[in-house]
């Protein structure tokens, strides 16, 4: 699973996820891309599950780029613990994704293969996604 090697602080505030993605919203590396349509908090497990779904479909063909990284810790208190007593321990890592953000890119495969691979991957992600091709945004 993806996670930062080290961080300045162990815990982070929840914050909000409003607005559109200003950067990272176009196809930069590959020929085809998977772009999110709604805001979400994507965990490292979901990123990895979607990556595995794409790789399983394209087999050894093509090159895949992951354009998001889980850099925010999500904390959780233990089960059956009363409120109070401070913030819980870091449980997992997530990435905040805004609408328009490109999450995965692929090259070296046909458009039909890329479209089907991204369709399989989008079922593993907690938001709606759309397919992009280079030059057609």
Swiss-Prot record:
GO terms for cellular component: cytosolic large ribosomal subunit. The keyword RNA-binding applies. One of its GO terms (molecular function) is structural constituent of ribosome. Keywords: Ribonucleoprotein, Ribosomal protein, RNA-binding, rRNA-binding, tRNA-binding. GO terms for biological process: translation. It comes from the Bacteria. InterPro entries: Ribosomal_uL16, Ribosomal_uL16_bact-type, Ribosomal_uL16_CS, Ribosomal_uL16_dom, Ribosomal_uL16_sf. PANTHER family: 50S/60S RIBOSOMAL PROTEIN L16, LARGE RIBOSOMAL SUBUNIT PROTEIN UL16M. Binds 23S rRNA and is also seen to make contacts with the A and possibly P site tRNAs. Part of the 50S ribosomal subunit. Belongs to the universal ribosomal protein uL16 family. This is Large ribosomal subunit protein uL16. The lineage of its organism: Bacteria, Pseudomonadati, Myxococcota, Polyangia, Polyangiales.
